[in-house]
């Protein structure tokens, strides 16, 4: 949760013209008067002085800059388009491309660059804003103290928004040193100054208040940085400083709630959120932040972590409603459609969090088991965050879940004959049983429309997975971290909903480069490897469903070649490869993949971040057991996975007319699980074997009882090739996990 408001750039970014060499006393007087009027909020008077200055010195672009700034503040900061246009014109006029900043002239132009960086920040063009801010930081020594602090605070905010916590902490250390030195210098000057006692005391009180506010802001930024880095011990120390300096304000309580959320103390996190006084917040028109929206979103994130997904989606919908209400109020103030950034305070350009909230809603709905509703949310979010490979995977999982059978059918079998007997025809001696077809090959999932049209079809799932693979970097073949498969658990990962469990950490290796994945937090090397495994598993499943066996085999082989592959996905890789090979009539190769000894582990893997997080807790502080649990997936154990392998191996032996081996596999598998857990495909396989053996009555008994019966030892020769009934391909077992992004 990053509820603390960003650096109030609007209050410090524009300073009036200061005296410079080569100007007359009249210009100096007008300049000082203009600045004093601007500081007092008398913008009309300020503009009058600036007009007089413009008449005297028409070539000074700084007067035009200050005029534009004064007019911007006169409009209550609602003419962003006009200010932006003026700044661009001035930039071209002084031929000051950012790349050319290398001298004292650029120090003189620093105010122009800073204002551009602030506008880029509010337009969410963070990379460009960082580029300008870092150039300014190179020349920070000659700057006035207040302006230097403003540059640093802007850069800190940008670094945190882009998950560069280490850089943010470095700048915060510089800021602390700067404020400490400035305070000492001021104390020394006050001792020898000739100001009156009254003016001196007022100035000192005002200066002290500003210093305390800056220190409080620094502590809040440190908490946000440590939260991103999952350094909970350091975060705990800073939280105490925040509570001491900011008290029980909404930003401090939101930050502490986020801290408790990361520790697993979910009830305490909810309690802290509920204790925050939202009514005291200045409002989104002044800060650009809708605190009610953040409140509901954070509650949704906490309940998601507690596996209370229905409550979570309830809170996310409340957050969406608040966000839509705020956006409706803001759009009502815009009158000129050609100026989309005007007619509203500049800070409100950052207010709309619709797409981050849609991301959260989509992930939550996917967990609830409503893939079509989740698809509608995520397909809207992907239009903004189209460079996020994890988001494309989530869309594909929506399509898969919307087009597959129920999980009970796949994992628990059927207690009745519903999945085996399609109908009964005839009467008496002519009575016949029509068995249900279990084949899913070459299924047509769309109705003739283009697969590029975003509908929850398997064809569109294939496109989503292709996009996800293309967005992954190619150099992922040098593993450094422990084996594990963690689908990045994220509900939006930027500053809108929660800090994700895979944010860039100070504990990461130097070789681990973070790949941006907004609105989630960045993907590190280990997360990229795990994500690639999940994408390949889904790709193989989708290709099998579409009947593209060669592509399915290709994806399955690539999956099995991954250096960091969890036991669960390795099991699926062998299963999908075997099914593709059987469809390609390469039975011997398929039998190799179906060897039960290939399955030695079905774990999902453990996130190194969760291990780090646990190590930061005190000895007597236990994490609540209600959240952050590993999903219960199929297969749940090595024995159940080997059972699936044996059932499929029996089918493969049938295709080679090796019925003794098939029967042995079938009954070996049946002995390993409860009779009610036998899948309908295995019962059909037993029926087929008995029919081939000539035991029609026994086959009927198997159908009637819907369970396997003891084997009959005599076998008859098979006269026709069996029809292979493959076990329904299992969807990649890990539910879409994601990182709760909290503000």
UniProtKB/Swiss-Prot annotation:
Compositional bias annotation for Polar residues: 484-506, 602-612
Gene3D superfamilies listed in its UniProt record: Tetratricopeptide repeat domain (1.25.40.10)
Coiled coil region boundaries: 77-107
Biased composition (Low complexity): 183-198
Gene Ontology BP, a term: negative regulation of translation
InterPro entries: CNOT10, TPR-like_helical_dom_sf, TPR_rpt
Region of interest (Disordered), ranges: 1-26, 183-204, 477-520, 602-634
Keywords: Acetylation, Coiled coil
Biased composition (Basic and acidic residues): 1-16
Assembly information from the UniProt record: Component of the CCR4-NOT complex at least composed of CNOT1, CNOT2, CNOT3, CNOT8, CNOT9, CNOT10 and TNKS1BP1.
The family this protein is said to belong to: Belongs to the CNOT10 family.
Name under which the protein is recorded: CCR4-NOT transcription complex subunit 10
